[in-house]
């Protein structure tokens, strides 16, 4: 009886708080039940309007794969701030920088290399998830350890970035060593959206690059394509391991409503026994659940 009175009092005094709490609990339950039926390890993190947080199976290490190109982009922004240079700075790319057996639209378009600005290289990494462009940026800034150190300076700790794309290409198991919890990656996105990290034009460029991302349209974005929202995201896609499982299929981003409300959403899928299409559908269905929860009046 006392509990009922307390709940009634909370509802009278803080109706929005109670409704939000009920909504988040229902969302957690629905996601948890859904992922328990999948032939994969699935982790989810949601941050609503920069404060309320929902996590499901967050206490695991999920391979980041190319999601770490977002972390890298922030480290590039910090590097430019410290060295007082702009994203228009040109780098010379040699043909030896363009590995042949990896995903690289940059190599396909300029097989002999050339001069490319930092902005152009980040368009390749963030729009198209180009692996060679990623390693060229690592070479420029000082390697994965520099990115790892910068992200930790933001107060994010439950992750590790140790290896380049070429490292992971040579040994698929190294993909597991670049890892994060879903919440840690959500915190990185929140830092981009809410904090002043470096020069505003550079920070806005990275945000816009997420909005115009061209990969993973069957994931977080899929159920939102006809909705009145702005979506920015970065995907990550792994190969199959020795057991035939997809090492990781990921998507991490934010959804902005016209009324100013937003949520950050990170969905990591590890060691999936499903097909690529069915694994991407897991992400899309969770994205739909989250959108519906936040669309309720």
Segments the model singles out, each with a brief description of its role:
Residues 23-33, 37, 139-140, 144-145, ...:
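Structured C-terminal helix/loop/strand segments within mature extracytoplasmic catalytic/sensor domains
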Residues 43-47, 55, 71, 92, ...:
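Soluble periplasmic/extracytoplasmic beta-strand elements of cell-envelope proteins
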Residues 63-91, 265:
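Active-site SXXK
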Residues 1-25:
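Bacterial Sec-dependent N-terminal signal peptides
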């Amino acid at each position: 009886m006392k509990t009922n009175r307390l709940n009634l009092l909370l509802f009278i005094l803080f109706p929005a708080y109670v409704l939000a709490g009920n909504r988040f609990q229902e969302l957690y339950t629905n996601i948890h039940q859904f992922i328990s039926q999948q032939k994969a390890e699935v982790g989810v993190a949601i941050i609503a309007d920069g404060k309320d947080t929902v996590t499901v199976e967050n206490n695991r290490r999920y391979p980041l794969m190319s999601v770490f190109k977002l972390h890298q982009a922030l480290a590039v922004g910090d590097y430019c701030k410290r060295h007082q240079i702009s994203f228009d700075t040109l780098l010379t790319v040699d043909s030896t920088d363009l590995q042949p057996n990896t995903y690289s639209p940059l190599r396909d378009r300029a097989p002999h290399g050339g001069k490319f600005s930092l902005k152009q290289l980040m368009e390749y990494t963030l729009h198209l998830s180009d692996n060679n462009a990623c390693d060229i940026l690592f070479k420029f800034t000082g390697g994965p350890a520099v990115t790892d150190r910068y992200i930790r300076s933001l107060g994010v700790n439950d992750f590790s970035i140790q290896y380049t794309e070429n490292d992971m290409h040579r040994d698929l198991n190294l993909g597991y060593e670049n890892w994060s919890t879903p919440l840690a990656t959500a915190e990185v996105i929140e830092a981009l959206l809410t904090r002043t990290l470096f020069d505003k034009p550079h920070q806005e460029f990275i945000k816009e690059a997420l909005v115009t991302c061209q990969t993973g349209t069957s994931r977080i974005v899929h159920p939102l394509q006809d909705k009145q929202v702005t979506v920015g995201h970065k995907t990550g896609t792994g190969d199959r391991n020795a057991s035939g499982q997809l090492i990781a299929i990921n998507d991490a981003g934010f959804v902005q409503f016209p009324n100013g409300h937003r949520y950050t959403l990170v969905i990591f899928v590890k060691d999936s026994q499903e097909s690529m299409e069915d694994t991407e559908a897991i992400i899309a269905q969770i994205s739909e659940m989250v959108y519906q929860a936040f669309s309720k009046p």
